[in-house]
From Swiss-Prot:
Species of origin: Homo sapiens
Underlying gene: EIF2B2
Coiled coil: none
Regulation of its function: Activated by the chemical integrated stress response (ISR) inhibitor ISRIB which stimulates guanine nucleotide exchange factor activity for both phosphorylated and unphosphorylated eIF2.
Protein name: Translation initiation factor eIF2B subunit beta
Primary location group: cytoplasm
Amino acid sequence: MPGSAAKGSELSERIESFVETLKRGGGPRSSEEMARETLGLLRQIITDHRWSNAGELMELIRREGRRMTAAQPSETTVGNMVRRVLKIIREEYGRLHGRSDESDQQESLHKLLTSGGLNEDFSFHYAQLQSNIIEAINELLVELEGTMENIAAQALEHIHSNEVIMTIGFSRTVEAFLKEAARKRKFHVIVAECAPFCQGHEMAVNLSKAGIETTVMTDAAIFAVMSRVNKVIIGTKTILANGALRAVTGTHTLALAAKHHSTPLIVCAPMFKLSPQFPNEEDSFHKFVAPEEVLPFTEGDILEKVSVHCPVFDYVPPELITLFISNIGGNAPSYIYRLMSELYHPDDHVL
């Protein structure tokens, strides 16, 4: 069929283009845009490819998911969306297969820890399965669109008048959170510049345009200023399975200073950043870029004698974090295991 062949080639081109974008580092896109694009591609794969049952579809999604995640292992949002879709397929198949889902809501910790992957049979064919899965993915896309607004809506519960708030670098979620609070409260924001990328300057400009009193400082001054700070509010790239963070370089320093001064550290992050990965998975955790910002190529004499590494991310252990604020509310780091079980199936943690 020429129509289906054209659809197939168009889909292949879209996937290839997305994979190439990931290989180049994702470009200027935010994690939310990456999540939406991944879901859009997976939805098209489900619609355009031929498959007869849930087992075949899951294998297809896994194969394409592995290809996408291998292109840029540090972009964990892509893998998270693949796992969400796999969980949707399992749930929709289970409903059609007559398996009740109600018991899942009341599982105990013991059950969560001891339940292995049940050898379910996904070979039955259901005509409704595709439309049900597409509908569930569309609902997830709608949920993604409202994540930032849902997080920002909780701002007034956490930020009070005349407080001094500290943040680091640039985060769209934190920016929206602070701007929402500024509509009714007056407070002062101190932004650590996040060298060598200095994204904190962009954050400071955006906040000052919104009428928020803002000060930019160097990362070296974090500890000296922390005694004046009431709260630290940061964003993150990934929330790891143990409740830790993979956040911009300098965040660990900020978190340690906050812990020393007993300053609450709040992390604003939507649920699609929650990943079942652990910090020992080096390929996906570390990301290094050219160290030109730290040591310019003009310093030729020194360059011959030293080896310079410029990591993009810091590891922030869960004991330094006070609270996570997501689009579904506030949670302690110790509750991450529960959220993980609701979002992803244990068999899908490794694609």
